[in-house]
Amino acid sequence: MEESVVDLRELPEKVFINLRHSRQRYDWDCGIACVLMVLTEADRESFMRDFVSVCKDEGFHRSTWTIDLCYLLRRYNVDHNFYTVTIGIHPGYHSNAFYRTVLAKDEQRINSRFGEAKMYGINVHEGSVEIVTILRHLRLNGPAIVLTNARLLTCDLCKLNKVSLELRQCLPWPAGYQGHYIVLCGYNKSRRKVYYRNPSFHNRVCVMSIDALEDARKSYGTDEDLILIDL
């Protein structure tokens, strides 16, 4: 694959954000594990202690969308901004018969949460975010939770070229797409790499190229969902 042209000259050479790793426990909670990575120690312990009741109170049970993660972050007073190219549920997802039941179950809740987001102090922005903006945020503000296609994730360190047996499916999509949340925590400009934490794995920092990240986060099914965290 030919490397894309992204002007990184304005950015410092390296950035790395220390985070306490959290591994997902089930096949549906990768996004929740990512939220845990950006909480304070006290809030993290509180959430884990009341995990079942919090999930029930939030109403997502075993089906979490990015907007659900935003409500969780707001619950624990974590400042953030949510960017997506689709407000609500993409109409194209209804055409797949296999997912009709899942979407029918979630659609009303998701649309309601989008509709009430402003009232709850959740900033939702419609549109695509350039990679330079994301890297600049890592430098100035904090980590980012990114929805990716797990089948396109790579890691230079653990030689993860495609989705591994260790990587669990988090969202019920067609075979070509497996939705999976990761936490971006830094970059190396000269090597054109980003650092990220994958909640499917034990405590480790993964590394992939900027171009690989762009492919994974802009794959059909992700809506380019991105949560920029302000720590």
What are these regions (language model features)?
Residues 1-5, 136-141, 145, 149-231:
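Noncatalytic regulatory segments and standalone regulatory/sensor domains
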Residues 1-120, 150, 175:
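Active-site-adjacent structural segments surrounding the nucleophilic cysteine of cysteine proteases
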Residues 55, 59, 116-137, 154, ...:
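Cysteine-dependent deubiquitinase/ubiquitin-like isopeptidase catalytic cores across multiple families
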Residues 66, 127-131, 177:
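A structural signal for well-ordered alpha-helical scaffolds and beta->alpha junctions
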Residues 92-102, 128-129, 134-137, 198:
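Short secondary-structure transition/capping segments
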